[in-house]
Design a protein with these regions (language model features):
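Extracellular/periplasmic carbohydrate-active domains that bind, remodel
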Residues: 24-427
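C-terminal segment of classical bacterial N-terminal signal peptides
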Residues: 16-25
Length: 427
C-alpha cells in the first residue's frame, strides 16, 4: 500500500498527503528464530546476546529477513534494529526490559545525556515491527527509583530512564499489531525520522511518570491510525527542538492521526518544545475518555516557532479535564488581564491557521482555554460545529477566532469569556 505525504488533498472527510514513499512490505528473505540463536524465553535468562545475534545475521545480506520471536518472555537489555528487517513478535511473545539499570549504556540523545532505549534503530531504513506480541519496558523499576529520588528532596540525583522504541534518523518504518507498554520514559519516539506508519497498536502505562505514548520529534510523513493509548503523560506529543534551543531544528510535519482512542493521559499535544515548528497535522475520528486534556497546543517564549495548518475533525471527548487548551504561556500561569509584549525572537511561538470541526465534549472540567501572546496572538483559529460542556466555559485572550455553530455550556461563570485582547467573529 502507499500512504502519501506532501500535498494536502481533501476528499470526503479524509486527508491524503501526496508524494510520500510507500512503506514496503518486507520481501521474502532469511527467517531467523531467536531460539535458534540460544534465546530461552523463560522470563529469567538474559536473552540480549541471542536476540541481537539473530538480528545481525538476518540482516547481514542485502535481502534482509524476518527475526521471529516465538511465545515466551525474553529478558533483554537494549537491542539495535538494522535495515531491511521485520521483527515479528508472536502471540504471547514478550520482550521484557532487563531490571538491571547497568545494562543500559549512557548515550547522548536529543542533545541530552540519557541511556539507550530498549529497542532502537540509528540511520536505518525499511524496518517493520509486527505481530501480536509485546514490548514491555519493565518500567516500574525506573518509576519507583524516580519517585524515590523526587521525594527525597535531594537535587541532582535523578537518573535518565530508557525510552521504549526509538527510530533515530531512520526512515520507511512500520509498526503494526503489537503492544508497547511500561517504558521507563517515552514509549515510541521517531527522532529526525521520515515515512512511518503506526497502526493497530496498544500503548499502555497508566499512572506512571512521563510515559508519553508516541512522540514524533522533528519527524515527517507519519500515520498514526487505530491506536489505543492509556499512559501517564501525553497520548501523542508532537515536538521539534527544545527549550532555549541553539538550533537549527527540523520541523515535525505531515502527520495524520485517525481512528484512535485515548484514555488515561494528556491527550494529543503539539509542543511544548517546538523550536523547529510543526506544520500539516490532521486529526480525525479520535475519542478521548477521561484524559487530562483533549486537544492541546502548547508552547512558550523560550521554545516556540511556527505552528500552522493544523486541523481536527470528528472529535469526541468524555470527562476530559480540559477539552481544548491552546496556550503560548505554557509552564507559566496564563495571564489575567493585559500583559506587556516582548520582542519577537526565533523562539517566539506563532500559532495560526488552526481548524476544529465537529468537536463535542461532555463532562469537562474546563470547556476551552485559548491564550496567545501579546506580541504573537493566535491567528486564524476556526471553530465549526463545536459543542462543549464543562464546569467552566471557554476563555479567549490574545487570539482571533471565527465561530460557526459553536455552543458552550458552563455550570458556573460565563459560557464564553472574550478578553478585550481577543476578537471573535461569529458566522
Amino acid at each position: 500500500m502507499k500512504i502519501a505525504v506532501g500535498v494536502r488533498l481533501a476528499a470526503v472527510g479524509a486527508v491524503i498527503w501526496a508524494g510520500m514513499a510507500s512503506v514496503p512490505a518486507m520481501a521474502a528473505g532469511k527467517v531467523c528464530d531467536v531460539k535458534t540463536y540460544g534465546a530461552k524465553g523463560d522470563g529469567t535468562t538474559k536473552d540480549t546476546i541471542a536476540v541481537q545475534k539473530a538480528i545481525d545475521e538476518c540482516t547481514a545480506g542485502k535481502g534482509g529477513g524476518t527475526v521471529e520471536v516465538p511465545a515466551g518472555t525474553y529478558v533483554i537489555a537494549p537491542i539495535v534494529l538494522k535495515s531491511n528487517m521485520t521483527l515479528h513478535l508472536a502471540k504471547d511473545a514478550t520482550l521484557l526490559g532487563s531490571p538491571d539499570m547497568t545494562d543500559y549504556s549512557k548515550v547522548v540523545f536529543a542533545r541530552h545525556p540519557t541511556v539507550q532505549p530498549l529497542v532502537g534503530s540509528v540511520n536505518a531504513e525499511n524496518i517493520t515491527i509486527n505481530g501480536e506480541g509485546t514490548i514491555d519496558g519493565n518500567g516500574h523499576i525506573w518509576w519507583d527509583y524516580v519517585r524515590g529520588v523526587r521525594n527525597s528532596g535531594v537535587l541532582g540525583t535523578d537518573h535518565p530512564r530508557p525510552m521504549g522504541v526509538v527510530f533515530d534518523h531512520s526512515k520507511h518504518i512500520r509498526m503494526e499489531g503489537v503492544t508497547v507498554q511500561n517504558s521507563g520514559f517515552w514509549q515510541i519516539v521517531p527522532y529526525y525520522a521520515d515515512d512511518l506508519v503506526f497502526r493497530n497498536l496498544r500503548v499502555l502505562a497508566p499512572l506512571s511518570p512521563n510515559t508519553d505514548a508516541i512522540d514524533p520529534f522533528s519527524s515527517s510523513n507519519i500515520v498514526i491510525d487505530h491506536v489505543f493509548a492509556s499512559t501517564g503523560d501525553d497520548n501523542v506529543a508532537i515536538k521539534s527542538g527544545e527549550i532555549n534551543s541553539p538550533g537549527p531544528d527540523d520541523p515535525s510535519k505531515n502527520i495524520t492521526i485517525t481512528d484512535c482512542t485515548f484514555e488515561r493521559g494528556h491527550g494529543i499535544s503539539i509542543g511544548s518544545e517546538i523550536a523547529g515548528g510543526v506544520q500539516n497535522v490532521h486529526v480525525e475520528r479520535v475519542s478521548f475518555k477521561g484524559t487530562d486534556n483533549g486537544i492541546r497546543i502548547k508552547s512558550a517564549r523560550d521554545r516556540g516557532n511556527d505552528v500552522s495548518n493544523i486541523s481536527y475533525k470528528d472529535i469526541t471527548m468524555e470527562n476530559v479535564k480540559i477539552a481544548i487548551y491552546i496556550t503560548e504561556f505554557y509552564a507559566s500561569k496564563d495571564p489575567e488581564g493585559e500583559v506587556p509584549a516582548e520582542p519577537v525572537t526565533r523562539l517566539t511561538p506563532k500559532f495560526h491557521d488552526i481548524t476544529m470541526e465537529n468537536v463535542t465534549a461532555t463532562g469537562s472540567g474546563v470547556a476551552a482555554s485559548i491564550v496567545g501572546l501579546p506580541e504573537s496572538p493566535v491567528l486564524g483559529l476556526t471553530l465549526k460545529n463545536v459543542h462543549l460542556e464543562g464546569k467552566t466555559g471557554m476563555s479567549i485572550a490574545y487570539a482571533k477566532v471565527t465561530m460557526d455553530n459553536v455552543t458552550v455550556k458552563a455550570d458556573t461563570g460565563e459560557a464564553i469569556k472574550v478578553a478585550p485582547t481577543a476578537t471573535v467573529t461569529r458566522k
